Amino acid sequence: MRAQLWLLQLLLLRGAARALSPATPAGHNEGQDSAWTAKRTRQGWSRRPRESPAQVLKPGKTQLSQDLGGGSLAIDTLPDNRTRVVEDNHNYYVSRVYGPGEKQSQDLWVDLAVANRSHVKIHRILSSSHRQASRVVLSFDFPFYGHPLRQITIATGGFIFMGDMLHRMLTATQYVAPLMANFNPGYSDNSTVAYFDNGTVFVVQWDHVYLQDREDRGSFTFQAALHRDGRIVFGYKEIPMAVLDISSAQHPVKAGLSDAFMILNSSPEVPASQRRTIFEYHRVELDSSKITTTSAVEFTPLPTCLQHQSCDTCVSSNLTFNCSWCHVLQRCSSGFDRYRQEWLTYGCAQEAEGKTCEDFQDDSHYSASPDSSFSPFNGDSTTSSSLFIDSLTTEDDTKLNPYAEGDGLPDHSSPKSKGPPVHLGTIVGIVLAVLLVAAIILAGIYISGHPNSNAALFFIERRPHHWPAMKFHNHPNHSTYTEVEPSGHEKEGFVEAEQC
């Protein structure tokens, strides 16, 4: 009886399995079955529609944050519990996310404890302060979005500011942020902000840092590595809490890359002054849920227009950018990079229209090279070693405008700046005034050196009585000595004073 019941259950289970399996088409064989399996595997790498934040991910799957293309990537878990490398293209960089079980996560971590001590420096000011940033000079040129940088700014808030112009809104754009948050290294003596530079890689490590007012959640240890070839690596050693649970009320919380360009415009309030406007032209945002203990992210740079050094290679490039050659600047660009101010000032957008490289070679109008001293970032810059950061307010007139295609960008087509004409009479007047001042100075020097000359006696005899008498006396140990006589009082002697 038991054997019959067991056989009946087995038949029922087999029938249910057949009912749940997909229908097998006519002519199906084992070869087609393997091909169907391979097709399903390939489909696992295709783009899928964006999932809303309210959706719950299915077990065995993970999700990468959206890129600028507006989609997401979903990956499956392999049978050996290893995770496929999550790869995404962000136009300027290809990002790869390695989970805690990946060997690459350990290989990409730079252990400063075993590194050459002469190359490791602990920044004492940043390690004992909150909301501070300090400028550091690299030993090599680091290409960031195609721009070679030699100076960066390390901030206590878990990010590196990559801009040239320091301002109070460093958290807004132009950053390399492994984990930007309200960290306070000054809370604990064990918290340090250190950096390492061996000529091929520059590493910044935030070691055992605590969140402001959330110290009970534990310490964070992570690093950002800038490689000489342009690669950027984020390594996470200790992440005691979910990044999504970190409050952004007092400080932005984000991870990724960002760059922007600066435009100088005349201020509508004060026509004589200029307003600096920052336009963010690209950003890479990482999914905060992927930032866990012993995880890593690697950004590999993609070719940009700026790398082309000739007109032929520029116009024949197969990049996703619309590269154009500006002969007057001798530069290849899409028009949207840190040199956009020059691109607009010299009319490069109009120059490239309808012209070929042969036209540039024969055109003598563009034979003169531009002034090499011109920089789109001319202006007052902060040179102090530390800078207070306040992402909520700003002391200057710098604004942040997220760039949208064709919105809000001024188009300066004229390469020349207009100003009031300088008349010849003004120049002559200035020259005469300079000559008059020079003559007075020379006369004074002569009189001081020859007090008994006719000229000196002439001025002394005709000076008003209420003027103080100025007498000059040479002393071997001091440069100049003066004697000042108050009006109405005559006295002998002099007062010595060393000229500073």
From Swiss-Prot:
This is Plexin domain-containing protein 1. One of its GO terms (cellular component) is extracellular region. The gene is Plxdc1. Residues 448-500 are cytoplasmic. Belongs to the plexin family. Keywords: Cell junction, Cell membrane, Glycoprotein, Membrane, Proteoglycan, Secreted, Signal, Tight junction, Transmembrane, Transmembrane helix. Residues 20-426 are extracellular. It is found in: Cell membrane; Cell junction, Tight junction; Secreted. It comes from Mus musculus.
